[in-house]
Amino acid sequence: MQTFKKIILAFKFSSACRSALEKAIQLSILNDAELFIFHALDYRLIGRDQRDSDLIELNQQMEQKFETEIKPLIDEFPKFKFGSSPSDPALEICKIAHRIQADLILLGCHDEPEKPRLARLDYVGMTILEKAPCPVMLVPP
């Protein structure tokens, strides 16, 4: 049985990603793996100075949102890291996966309210599937 040592979750603060978060936590605990949770900030902020007030404020908002919404779910699991930065989400996830030699990337599938039984993958997900340096798991909502 293959075990995973480094797992990345491409995370967006949405209901679609909640299922992926739960699966990522489950797999990380089961495999005693490191869990990297990455949230891409608005790509239009790429290249801004790290001292830019808009960027600082956005990073603080993401950290606070993580602390209140996500950290309580993984508080007892010490092997996690959360990161966010302005980036193209798909390319950044693939870069991180390559850099840390990830064993698995998890993605949540988007749901369409008018088609409740249909899950779909958007451009970000398709790009990750095409460029990922490791296996990718799609998690339905």
Where are the regions that the model predicts?
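Structural beta-alpha unit
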Residues: Q2, L73-I105
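Small/aliphatic-rich secondary-structure junction motif
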Residues: Q2-R51
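Short, glycine/charged-enriched secondary-structure capping and boundary segments
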Residues: E22-I25, Q50-S53, A97-H98, A119-Y123
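Active-site phosphate/pyrophosphate- and oxyanion-stabilizing loops and adjacent acidic/basic residues
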Residues: I25, K71, C94, M126
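A generic structural signal for well-ordered alpha-helical segments
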Residues: S28, I74, A97, I128-L129
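General small-molecule cofactor/ligand-binding pocket signal
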Residues: F36-F38, K81-S85, M137
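A short acidic, glycine-rich active-site loop
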Residues: D54-K65
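Gly/Ser-rich helix-loop-strand patches that form or flank binding pockets
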Residues: H98-P141
